[in-house]
Regions:
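Conserved ATP-binding/catalytic motifs of P-loop helicase motor domains
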Residues: 1-366
Length: 366
């Protein structure tokens, strides 16, 4: 998820230090928040690339092969059918039932992927309630995170802003160890391979602005993670990259949760999600996709209809203008004729007046 501005800054510093930079990534995953296409541009500029295609994460080789189909976005209906056949698709009556099921079934450390931050907050709140009821989280003394939800001892949280003075990084996860009365949070890093995980102190101001519960997260929050199992909630806001990222986090199992009436409905939703592709596959791919998207429109579609209508309106406008010109010419001729008629009328009136005056004069003389 390296954007162009960050890449430029990184490469500038590396060049000044005489360092070598190797860019590694999967272009089928989520794109950078800023301007993307960095991997594609680097490959075109240097021309020295290596395609790493061997899979190591998954314990099931058949599922590993299935993830390649997700990556390519090809035949999403077939992909769904295979997921359903091996029991990895769970249907729910509504969102609340889905949250209840995930709360009850998700194991500690498993990744839970949702489409939006609001979805994450709703599921985090429900999971936290379940952990309090199970005695895994102490709700006696709490701080408030950036999502507005309380944080207590035992909660899993995520820091969202790099801060070298505190020793924390964006998207880093922590288990809360202690909370003071003023809201200061002491937390131990999780997911680290250190023999002695670090503990950091997070001031209440930082927690309120840059930390929140992290049981569930968007695909941006779980991308790069490797865990034993994962759960992905499908919605109308889920993209193909979100499905691919969510369904490839778990070594052993990756479950898809869908609110749907039946498997046929869920299948349609899955196909629609796989057609919403937000992955950053480079400029060439984007240009090709744009060409394909407008190909039908240009030859026979809305664009042709609009073009034909504009041509028809132009023709009608020209005809109306020509008609207006003719009427103006006719009006000018009529004005000229009326002026001539007025002159003739004036002459006739003058002659009649003179004749009347002459007749009156004769009458007087007689």
């Amino acid at each position: 998820m390296l954007d162009q501005d960050t890449a430029r800054a990184l490469l500038t510093v590396a060049a000044a230090a005489g360092a070598t930079v190797a860019l590694v990534g999967d272009r089928a995953q989520l794109s950078a928040v800023g301007r993307g296409g960095v991997l594609d541009m680097a490959a075109q500029i240097r021309g020295r690339t290596y395609d790493m295609s061997e899979l190591h994460r998954f314990t099931d080789p058949d599922y590993a092969t299935l993830t390649l189909a997700m990556r390519d976005r090809k035949n999403p209906g077939d992909v769904f059918d295979q997921l359903a056949a091996i029991g990895l698709v769970t249907l729910h009556a509504d969102d609340e039932q889905a949250r209840e099921h995930i709360t009850a079934s998700a194991r500690h450390g498993e990744a839970i992927t949702v489409a939006t931050n609001d979805d994450a907050a709703a599921l985090n709140e429900r999971i936290r309630t379940g952990r309090i009821q199970a005695g895994e989280v102490d709700d006696t003394v709490t701080a408030t995170g950036s999502d507005g939800l309380p944080i207590g001892r035992g909660d899993l949280i995520q820091t969202r802003k790099n801060d070298t003075t505190l020793g924390v990084a964006n998207r880093q996860q922590w288990i809360v160890q202690h909370i003071t009365e003023d809201g200061t949070v002491y937390a131990r890093e999780t997911g680290s391979e250190r023999k002695s995980p670090r503990t950091v102190m997070l001031p209440s101001e930082y927690v309120g602005k840059h930390a929140h519960l992290s049981y569930a997260a968007t695909a941006y929050g779980v991308q790069g993670a490797t865990v034993n199992g994962s759960h992905t909630m499908l919605s109308d806001a889920t993209s193909a990259a979100g499905v691919y990222v969510g369904m490839t986090r778990g070594r052993q199992t990756n479950r898809l949760h869908v609110v749907a009436a039946d498997m046929a409905d869920a299948r349609v939703q899955f196909i629609e999600a796989m057609e919403r592709d937000r992955a950053d596959r480079g400029l060439d791919h984007a240009a090709h996709a744009a060409q394909e998207a407008v190909r039908g429109l240009v030859t026979d579609g809305p664009v042709k209809f609009v073009t034909d209508e504009l041509a028809r309106l132009d023709h009608e406008t020209e005809r109306a203008l020509r008609g207006a010109e003719r009427w103006e010419q006719i009006a000018d001729r009529r004005d000229t004729e009326r002026a001539a008629h007025r002159a003739e009328d004036d002459e006739s009136t003058a002659a009649l007046r003179k004749a009347v005056e002459a007749a009156e004069q004769v009458r007087v003389e007689v």
